[in-house]
Structure formats: C-alpha cells, structure tokens
Amino acid sequence: GHLFQDPMKGTAPNMSIEENLALAYLRASAVKGKFFSRISQKEKQMFREKLALLDMGLEDRMKNPVGLLSGGQRQALTLLMATVVTPKILLLDEHTAALDPATAEKVLNLTKRIVAENKITCLMITHNMQSALELGNRTLMMNSGEIVLDIKDEERKGLTVADLLEKFKEGVGAQLDNDRILLS
C-alpha cells in the first residue's frame, strides 16, 4: 500500500466512499472477477466498521462522493484503502505534510495504530523529525541523496529532535537550516 503527500491523489473523487473502498479491496484481495454490484453486505459492513475507527463520521456517508470530503478525510480514507487488505509494506510519502496540524496528528495516530495492530512493515518519508521518532524502530536521515544517519532500536529510544539535529551535525559537519524541518 502507499499514500501520497497530496490528499487529492489516491482516491477517485467522483466515486463514493464505498466504491473507493470496494475498488481498493477488490484490487488488493484474492477475490478476482468481482464487480462493484457484487460487493456483499458483509464487505460493506467491514467498510463501515473500518470507517467508524476514523471517528470522522464517514461511516454514515458511505454513498457520498469522495470529492466532497476535506483533505484530511480523504487522506484518512486513502490510508484505509491502502490497508483494507493488510499489505506486506506500507509506503508513506509525506502523507501528513498537506494537512492542518490537528488533522495531521489524527492521521498519524491512525497510521501508528494500523501499522502496530497489523504488524505492517512501514517506510515513512517525512521532514517532520518528531513524527519520524514516534513511528517505527529505525530512523534514516539523508543529505544530498546520501544516508548520513542510521539509528536503530535501543539507540532511538528517548531521542529528541534536538538529539537528531546534533547527530546530523556530527555526521555531516553542518547544521540543518530548513525552518520547516526545525519547526516540525
């Protein structure tokens, strides 16, 4: 599964929430040759239950077009679509960057829960170093396309953003000066 930075990607805006989930489910599952009209009540109920976990009221709007949803709602839906059938790996490309802080936190918490509950290997690309420390068990930092820092397991525990900045400075010999990174 994968999520893009842009919440408008990853969903079909003219299709309903239910149709988007059905498309993702049919694409990812072993069920082949099944059509939208053949989605069972059991599958619809599964979609409703997964949507309810978002706590955004989408379970009561399953027939609504996705194009009517906010960016945060669409990104949360895209996360469900990417994990409606547990993937071997989940790729997150700045998946909270375009969201307001409250919605970004909600989507990140949902991501953490889904990844942990389903034991999904997850690769998250982010400029938000706090998020990088909160999710996963390994943090890689890059500079000019090169890995300059690789922190795993025990070494990561208790690290702060300030610690990461210091390790980056030691590894590269330069400070990070990007406000977006420093303020994350």
Indicate where each model-derived feature is located.
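Walker B catalytic motif
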Residues: 94-95
